């Protein structure tokens, strides 16, 4: 007989859906995010990314630099209710230089929505992020966007997804025309045609006119050529396509496909309704104590993101926690796995981009914001009851390196604070020279834009101007076995040794050729392209 709390947890899990959106830049991710919020009633009017001077800034792009450039460069958490469900939407950076932030966000997601531009198909960043989803066996839902513009043939797009990503596809709806001739979609769930009408530039919910495929009026409403093309293509996909298999969807082997136009809102609600039915509910996580089910009564969760200065007026630091099990309650006391400290979780917050509301309780699948007084690191576990720690979150190997210089000694404290807080939140990796005399931090990034963001934020949020001194390295490898393993092999040529933020040795190479030379010279030296972002918590017993 389940306890009262277990019943409460089971009901809460049943009513929760959690997903991250992945895409290549400019596929329309921020627009789709806003339109989902529009249908969820979380906002009443969508602020399109284009023509920002005339319209409101997009809700999910809250950082000043994002609003200036019109791109997403940090993950955002947006929570809203739709029908019977509580939805946690994890918006991720679209820019490829911020794939590491996206990777961390995917660790907290139960499902992924892959957004594809109908004109361009699969693009490099989408492929890269798909590989991350595949590693975690995340269910992937595909939204093929921009049907109101000229694009590639739908069958061609499905074939590309199947061939390049190795996924089976199931078209939940099917487009009627494209570009100027786009007239709507046929929904295979309801067996109805949904007619396309542009609505107020997409600011408000689309007007949804539905009609049966066999309705006599259809000949006067649809282009005859497109009507017969639709019938032929439906016959083709229903005869030759795979049937919908939710077990395969949940294992990440089949992707349900949706067609629509986020900018005009068309197809967004059809997607949202089907997603609630098909998506994976919050599930179990592996820990040092084995598999932890969401209905396990003791509260636990992990930190997947830190953000400084979400409200620059208050110089705050927020830790984003994915609730994995049990019920979170305001002012509860928990244990911090890495340090063993006991922490009281006061002032928890429900997050909505930059806005936050106080929170009384949360359940598995929810994302909560906690004030971070310098205690939390990315990958940290918090728990009640029996000791446990979840697997750490690994990080990407950086490819660009530069000394960060502070030319103004009077700003030393602000400089140190800014670098420390940006390092904590994972905006960039920070390394240090082995030589104690060289005290300038080394920025280590996946892409150039990360450097620009760090410099911009140091100036904008901490009042510190900085300059960069680029270093001629492009490959980083962590030394397995730490300093003792490194000392045992003696001097290493064609590499320099630096320390990461946790004091662990990292070798920097100018190119892959130098890395191969070191492998040849020191075959017993084990190197790794990835390292956990936090100190190993698997020591917790």
From Swiss-Prot:
GO biological process, one term: regulation of translational termination
Residues noted as binding GTP in the record, renumbered to the chain: 23-30, 91-95, 145-148
Domain tr-type G residues, every copy: 14-283
SUPFAM superfamilies: EF-G C-terminal domain-like, P-loop containing nucleoside triphosphate hydrolases, Translation proteins
A Pfam family it matches: EF-G_D2
GO cellular component: cytosol
Identification of the protein by name: Peptide chain release factor 3
Natural source organism: Acaryochloris marina (strain MBIC 11017)
The gene coding this protein: prfC
């Amino acid at each position: 007989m389940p306890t009262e709390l277990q019943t409460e947890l089971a009901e809460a899990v049943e009513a929760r859906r959690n997903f991250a959106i992945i895409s290549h830049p400019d596929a329309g991710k921020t627009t789709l995010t806003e339109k989902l919020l529009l249908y969820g009633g979380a906002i009443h009017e969508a602020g399109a990314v284009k023509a920002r001077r005339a319209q409101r800034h997009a809700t999910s792009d809250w950082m000043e630099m994002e609003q200036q450039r019109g791109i997403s460069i940090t993950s955002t958490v947006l929570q809203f209710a739709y029908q019977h469900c509580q939805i946690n939407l994890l918006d991720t950076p679209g820019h490829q230089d911020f794939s590491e932030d996206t990777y961390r966000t995917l660790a907290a997601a139960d499902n992924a929505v892959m957004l594809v531009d109908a004109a361009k198909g699969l693009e490099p960043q989408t492929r890269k992020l798909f590989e991350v989803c595949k590693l975690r066996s995340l269910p992937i839902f595909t939204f093929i966007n921009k049907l109101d513009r000229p694009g590639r043939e739908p069958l061609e797009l499905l074939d590309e997804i199947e061939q390049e990503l190795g996924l089976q596809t199931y078209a939940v709806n099917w487009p009627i025309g494209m570009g100027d001739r786009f007239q709507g979609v046929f929904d295979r769930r309801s067996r109805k045609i949904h007619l396309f009408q542009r609505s107020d530039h997409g600011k408000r919910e689309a007007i949804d006119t539905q009609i049966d495929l066999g309705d006599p009026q259809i000949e006067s409403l649809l282009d005859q050529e497109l009507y017969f093309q639709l019938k032929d293509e439906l016959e083709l996909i229903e005869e030759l396509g795979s049937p919908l298999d939710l077990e395969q969807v949940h294992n990440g082997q089949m992707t349900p496909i949706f067609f629509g136009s986020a900018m005009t809102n068309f197809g967004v609600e059809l997607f949202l309704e089907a997603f609630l039915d098909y998506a994976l509910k919050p599930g179990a996580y592996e820990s040092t104590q084995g598999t932890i089910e969401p209905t396990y009564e003791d509260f636990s969760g992990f930190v997947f993101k830190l953000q400084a200065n979400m409200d620059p007026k208050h110089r705050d630091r927020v830790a984003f926690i994915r609730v994995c099990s049990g019920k979170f309650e305001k002012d509860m006391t928990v244990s911090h796995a890495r340090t063993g400290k006991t922490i009281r979780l006061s002032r928890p917050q429900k997050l909505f981009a930059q806005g936050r509301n106080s929170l009384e309780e949360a359940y598995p699948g929810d994302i909560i914001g906690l004030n971070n007084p310098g205690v939390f690191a990315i990958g940290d576990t918090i728990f009640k009851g029996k000791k446990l720690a979840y697997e750490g979150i690994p990080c990407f190997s950086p490819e660009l390196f530069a000394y960060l210089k502070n030319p103004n000694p009077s700003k030393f404290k602000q400089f140190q604070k800014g670098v420390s807080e940006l390092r904590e939140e994972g905006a960039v990796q920070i390394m240090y020279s082995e030589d104690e005399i060289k005290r300038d931090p080394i920025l280590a990034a996946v892409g150039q834009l990360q450097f620009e963001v760090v410099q911009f934020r140091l100036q904008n949020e901490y009042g510190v101007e900085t300059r960069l001194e680029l270093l001629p390295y492009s490959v980083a490898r962590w030394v397995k076995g730490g300093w003792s393993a490194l000392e045992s092999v003696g001097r290493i040529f064609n590499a320099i040794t630096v320390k990461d933020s946790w004091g662990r040795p990292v070798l920097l190479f100018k190119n892959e050729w130098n890395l191969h030379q070191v492998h040849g010279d020191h075959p017993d030296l084990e190197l790794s392209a990835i390292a956990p972002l936090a100190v190993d918590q698997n020591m917790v017993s």
